[in-house]
């Protein structure tokens, strides 16, 4: 890093007047009604049913409760909301037949957003490829790219008068890693690095084609992609092996995707590392010349980057057998991530973690944002599209005192302001999540929301963090 954060002593006292203070959602995690109203199946439906641990129905019942949530947004000064359109609610089979009821649902939802002066920021894919396409290989099959571009183009046309801010994908890294490395998503493949890289590349090609469809179609508004990014630190900054481990995962999660976003191709150092890692699992990455032509053109038209960031990582060298265990229960200390040829996730003494073993180190957000600004000077704007803390929120006497979440958000916003002082252009911040939601791998005991949800009654209760956030949004400053 060429910027010393210790030298940034006077972050701006105020957020800009046009800064968005938002909350984030995802269709499958909030809507419920996963098999009704004409919606087609996704791989998660059968995957979760077979596990028998928890159900995505009714989740937060957002399909029916969205007027309540949006009214609360208006009352609490939340002026932006991240939403996703469930692809299979529009195209039940991914292509072909259109579900008119699903199309109308999103018209009604966006209208309600504007009624309450809450700007919708809309994502087209949030881990929910329609089942028929998933069964053909998901984004490892290039037919899915074609289908996604058709779906995206339909949405651009259909909702042109209601949606200004679009994102193509949510967290391409998480989709690839959870499906092909950690094995916690449908498919359940573990430690296949070549497939993870191929998934990342193909989804970035789909992003590029959708961006060009948006640009060439003359649609008003803006478009970008959301990447899940974490700054990687070597556990021992003086150990070449630890430095290499940190760089390995940095390329896998961050640099490969950011090169594709802002360069439209892959720098030599990126490609060398990616090919070396892919070979560990006995595979290669197919990158066609025509892919790069499309991606280079699209790189000119990214209006912003969405950054989902919850933590950083400390890595040390590891060359043993793959050992991956996801902490999906909140039993602290049970998570393990050791991948042969990449490295091992470790905790650094003195740095706190959550019950789900997530590192709390807000300075990592600063380092990440400055890295993006320095390596990709052609970036235009960044939105923090997810940041937040999973917590076992205690509900007592009609109130939720979630002071640890307030502390977490405040610390991250302070480091965000420091990044803005050194010239990073950030347009807004979205807490994950607006309300308590269904979690893909944790169910319902890991709560993130501003609004506490009683999942039996669907009653919403704003937490202490919601009132704190209202004050920040109204004053546009941190006290």
Question: In which residue ranges do the predicted regions lie?
Answer:
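Catalytic domains of carbohydrate-active enzymes, especially glycoside hydrolases
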Residues: 65-86, 300-304, 375
